[in-house]
Structures are given as C-alpha cells and as structure tokens.
C-alpha cells in the first residue's frame, strides 16, 4: 500500500500542472498508513493474515532513537526517487544538472539552519560517519605536531570508540568526567588542554538524559587556546537554536533521521575560515571537496535539506509544544508515584528527552510490561546490553537506579492523548511490579536497605 501510494504521489508531483499545494496533514490527526502517517499506534499492513483485521502498533515514544519521516520531507524526496534520478556528479547532461541543483539547494538548507556557509557542509551517511571524520580526520592531519584529544565520559559510543581507536594509534585522550548534573566542569576542561591538544569533542545534547552542555562557553575556551572544537549535535540540530559562528564551533555532526528526515544521511560542518584541515577517511572519486568520496544520494540529501528547512521554520513552535507535553508527563508520573528520580540537570535540559529511574523496579521488566508503548532504557546503539547505562554511571547514579531507568521521547508528532496513555500505563505497571518486589515491601515496613549486610550464597 505504501509503495503504491508513493508512486502515485511521485507521479502527481512531477506531472501535475502548477497549482496550490495540498494542505499539510493537521497535527495530532490519525492518518492511514498509505498517507505516510508519522503517528504511532496506526494500523499496520496485514498481508500475512488479512482476515485478522488491522493490527495496532505501540505508541511511539522513542524519538531519541529515531524520528518518523515528516510527510513534507517525503514529498520533497519523491520526485528524486522516481523521475530525477541522475548522478549529481554527472556534468554533461540535464539529469546530472537537475540532481546537482537539488543537492546544492539541500546544502544551503542545512547551512542556513546552523548559520554556516553552504561550502562548509559535507554530506555523509549519518552522525556516526560525521563523528569519525571529525575526530579521526583532525587528529590524523595534525598528528606530527599534536597527539592529544579531549572528550567526555558521556559521549555517544561512536565518539568514544573513535577515541579508543586513536589511542591504539599512539594518541593520548583525556576523558573528562561530568558532574552529577551531567554537565562538564569548565575549569577541568581548561586544565586538561595541553600544548599538543588538537581537538575537544563534546556533544551538544546527550542522547540518553537530554542534558545540554555549555557549548558557547566551551567554544570560547577552545578558541582562546587555539584548539579545534567539535560537537556531536545529532540530538540538538533543529531542536534548539545553534549558530556555529556565535558558538565558535569548528566541526559539527548532523543526523537526518533525528530531525524527521530519512535514515542513511547526515552532514558534517567543517569551518573554512580559519580553515580546519581534515584527513579523509575513504578514497575514491573525491566528491564533497575530497573529504567524503562516493556518489551523493540525491533523494536522501534532498530529504535532509527539507527536514532542516521545516525544523528552522517550526523550531520555536515545536519547542514550546514539546516542553508542555514533557512537563505534563513528568508531573503526572511524579505526583502519582514515589521514589522516581529524573536523571540529569532539569534546568539545562532539552525537554523532549526525559530519563526517569523508578526505584525498586527493574527497567527491563517495566519495558516488557509497557508493550503498548515503544520506549527504551537508553541509547538504541547499546540497547541490547544488559549492563547499566555508562551515562548514568558517569553522573553518579547507583547501579540499582541505573538499572531502573526508562527514557521517554516526546517529539513533533506526539499528542497529548499519547502522553496521558503512557503515563497511565507507566503508573499502573510500576505499582504492579513494586507489589511483587520484596525490596519495596521492606521499604514500606520502614527498613533501611543500606543498613542491611547482604551475603552471597
């Protein structure tokens, strides 16, 4: 159904005479799957058992893992999937010229969102590749003079693994601790910078606890010490205002699927003045100014550009709406359940990412109980691990609370009804699971669990 609808929409987009655009889908309305609905809990295709009728999917509350494709983004992409399929690097015919023009328009849209020059935007396959290019590319280019990097203990796994890879090559890496709030101590950052430090990499918004780092202050420190500053902004671009010049950011990683764009595409901002030099990670045709060889996927970058344009237009509205829904979720859970802890700084925090720990409840058990709501206990990249979140451990959360954490994601298409349903089910199952917990029973009897000396058998 979805494929047939896509072909019909593409044909209309390419062949229809000019006229007024159809109205965008109204926020909060349930749309049919064939209409490319981003909303959760919509009927799924039932080709395997059509007689069974529509199957309801869970409500989607995991927007830090990925976001649904905005229908307006899909509309922008469709012509380049069907009719305008030329290679944007083919300079001898109209097919290539059309795709190149679309690619450069997308580059402008991405640059406009972060206050950059379009020539400073390099398209990649996503934030993971962008982070690798930034960290490994800068470190290797300046390795003859500078062999030291600085990052934090709460970065995304791809940043931490890139740094560990560089350590194996002989580089030195300082992993800054964070405070209980999840925010770094700027004095510790200043003290960690050495004469041979080439790069500082600190993420803008944490993907697990939503904490916002003081990016502008970090940028000023790095600029004054003549050290390049990279930020992984996958969870921040399009959600909070960012300006690479005002914040003195030298490199920035961007992801398409975290801002209601397609998966498989991202970008890296690399400053031109003063120029940041980067060693390319892959060899090939020298596309993207030699920094990222490989044919640029026109439909995907068009989608990324459209997502950035929509985000720029609606950022203020989205932020107010998401803040209101997030506050509703937090307050309604906390007023109904005792012993609930919000992880991370509540003030310096992106409201769409809420990480709560429910004492005396195992997080995995709660996730299984909440089968009607799509949630996670942390980063999607490490969700298969049963170990407690390294981010929560870094902010000093004890192991039991770290194991009991759930991340709630509120996004552009989340409705008030979905928030209320999630709250209702969460309260219901936390109470049920606590009633089954001997630890909860002991606490209700007034026993201090910390005073008990446990023995192994």
From Swiss-Prot:
GO cellular component, one term: nucleus
Binding site for pyridoxal 5'-phosphate: 127-128, 235, 255, 257, 295
Residues carrying Cysteine persulfide: 381
Species this protein is from: Pongo abelii (Sumatran orangutan)
EC id: 2.8.1.7
UniProt modified residues of type N6-(pyridoxal phosphate)lysine: 258
Enzyme class: transferase
HAMAP family according to UniProt: Cys_desulf_IscS
PROSITE patterns to which the protein is assigned, alphabetical: AA_TRANSFER_CLASS_5 (PS00595)
Pfam families, alphabetized: Aminotran_5
Superkingdom of this protein's organism: Eukaryota
Binding site for [2Fe-2S] cluster: 381
Cofactor names: pyridoxal 5'-phosphate
Keywords, alphabetical: Cytoplasm, Cytoskeleton, Iron, Iron-sulfur, Metal-binding, Mitochondrion, Molybdenum cofactor biosynthesis, Nucleus, Pyridoxal phosphate, Transferase, Transit peptide, Zinc
Similarity comment: Belongs to the class-V pyridoxal-phosphate-dependent aminotransferase family. NifS/IscS subfamily.
Gene Ontology terms, MF aspect: cysteine desulfurase activity; iron-sulfur cluster binding; metal ion binding; protein homodimerization activity; pyridoxal phosphate binding
Entry protein name: Cysteine desulfurase
Gene Ontology biological process terms from the UniProt entry: [2Fe-2S] cluster assembly; [4Fe-4S] cluster assembly; Mo-molybdopterin cofactor biosynthetic process
PTM text: N-gluconoylated. Cysteine persulfide intermediate is reduced by thiol-containing molecules like glutathione and L-cysteine. Persulfide reduction is a rate-limiting step of cysteine desulfurase catalytic cycle.
Activity control: Active only in complex with LYRM4.
Residues noted as binding Zn(2+) in the record, renumbered to the chain: 381
Gene encoding the protein: NFS1
